[in-house]
């Protein structure tokens, strides 16, 4: 499988990295090989209503007039409890979006950790998806009675061939809605794959593995992946591609900022490319009116109030580093770090309302400080900012956006992070011995808003 640069229009400046080559790349098949089908994959949509209509329009354009079989693959986290409009409306826009997908092409959803944000019982979520004509896959089990919430594998007719689709979720229970955690039994991804993947893929023609386990879990699945399979990852809000023999592994971005197209060829090769979803593009008429009406109905004056203005749009990574720098300034320390999924999307240009800002900084919390040596701080910085090109082996899954200033020969350095990252320091900092103390009267959202925007 060769790797070639994408055309400029495919370049996704917001978050793009490709593990296999500098810049954003495509894993490409031979241009003269017969196309068997195309998978349009996306994950971690999180009720991103500012781009939902544009994403649907892009999918419509991809499929319109094509005689090639298509499959739409949604790899979890469709809903977002932090979106007040989603909560108040019962996710009416999300459900309408989902309902349009099977009208375009066969659609498969693999359950993520936010898909029961609005409806705690996943059985109800799965039943509603199936009523729309969506196929659901998952390895999550109902801990109350041992029933699976969905089949772990399905075989779908796909043009002249068939496609076996396998689904796996993240076993990080603390990322699921609290009300549902006692109802969920989720195996460790690697252990589950070791025990089940070969059986589930036995006799398969074409193969698609959808994992919402995140990079750390996927790393245990990949060695078990049959050559020539396509694997789509999610959960970490990353955008990258990786080749393994004739297999392709891709993370597709988040917040409806992008989708990934995987083209399967008759010679066994797979071409993978990423397309940005333009915020300024025309939304699909099938969704545009509903989005406008729903926002007008459910947003309060306070949520429509302008917090400040941004002179330019920032990518997600730029936003993360700007927030980290603002946290460091507010706490009077040398370095700031914020968890990657504390953020949703990049800061837009122009006036930013409270509602729009809440999509940028999803969660509030305390700021926590710790003291480290300059050498340890350098190590944390090397681990941070994984929106850059880097190999799969270097990726940690959960990561931090970080910003630091000079130390001027200091023997110690101080850092600040959120209470979530302090509590989960093993995942984010790669250590368990940092001693944190609270930075009094500082909150994540207040500091971020003041640092990002000029009032």
Language-model-detected regions and their locations in the chain:
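Acidic, metal/ion-coordinating pockets
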Residues: 3-6, 10-13, 31-282, 318-320, ...
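Sec-dependent signal peptide hydrophobic core
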Residues: 15-19
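Catalytic centers of hydrolytic enzymes
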Residues: 36, 42, 47, 256-330, ...
């Amino acid at each position: 499988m060769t790797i070639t640069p994408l055309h400029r229009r495919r370049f996704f400046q917001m978050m793009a990295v490709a593990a296999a080559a500098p810049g954003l790349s495509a894993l490409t098949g031979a241009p003269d090989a017969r196309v068997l089908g195309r998978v349009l994959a996306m994950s971690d949509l999180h009720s991103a209503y500012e781009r939902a209509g544009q994403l649907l329009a892009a999918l419509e354009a991809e499929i319109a007039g094509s005689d090639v079989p298509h499959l739409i693959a949604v790899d979890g986290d469709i809903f977002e409890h932090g979106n007040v409009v989603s909560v108040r409306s019962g996710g009416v826009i999300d459900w309408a979006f989902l309902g349009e997908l099977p009208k375009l092409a066969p659609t498969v959803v693999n359950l993520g950790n936010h898909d029961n944000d609005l409806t705690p019982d996943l059985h109800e979520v799965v039943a509603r998806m199936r009523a729309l004509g969506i196929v659901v896959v998952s390895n999550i089990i109902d801990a109350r009675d041992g029933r699976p919430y969905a089949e772990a594998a399905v075989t779908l007719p796909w043009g002249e061939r068939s496609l076996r689709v396998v689904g796996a979720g993240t076993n990080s229970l603390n990322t699921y809605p609290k009300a549902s955690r006692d109802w969920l039994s989720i195996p460790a991804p690697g252990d589950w794959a070791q025990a089940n993947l070969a059986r589930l893929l036995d006799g398969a023609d074409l193969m698609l593995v959808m994992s919402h386990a995140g990079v750390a879990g996927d790393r245990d699945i990949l060695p078990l992946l049959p050559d020539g399979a396509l694997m789509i990852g999610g959960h970490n809000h990353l955008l990258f591609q990786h080749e393994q023999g004739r297999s392709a592994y891709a993370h597709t971005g988040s917040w409806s900022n992008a989708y990934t197209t995987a083209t399967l060829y008759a010679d066994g090769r797979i071409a993978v490319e990423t397309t940005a979803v333009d915020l300024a593009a025309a939304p699909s008429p099938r969704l545009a009116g509903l989005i406008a009406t729903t926002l007008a109905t459910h947003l309060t004056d306070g949520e429509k109030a302008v917090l400040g203005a941004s002179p330019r749009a920032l990518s997600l990574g730029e936003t993360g580093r700007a927030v980290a720098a603002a946290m460091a300034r507010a706490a009077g320390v040398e370095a700031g770090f914020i968890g990657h999924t504390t953020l949703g999307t990049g800061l837009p240009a122009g006036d930013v309302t409270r509602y729009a800002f809440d999509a940028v900084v999803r969660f509030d919390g305390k700021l926590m400080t710790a003291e480290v040596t300059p050498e340890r701080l350098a190590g944390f910085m090397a681990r941070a900012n994984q929106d850059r090109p880097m190999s799969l082996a270097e990726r940690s899954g959960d990561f931090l956006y970080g910003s630091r200033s000079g130390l001027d020969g200091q023997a110690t350095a101080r850092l600040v992070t959120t209470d979530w990252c302090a509590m989960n320091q093993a995942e984010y900092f790669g250590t368990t011995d940092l001693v944190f103390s609270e930075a009094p009267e500082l909150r994540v959202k207040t500091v971020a808003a003041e640092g990002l925007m000029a009032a």
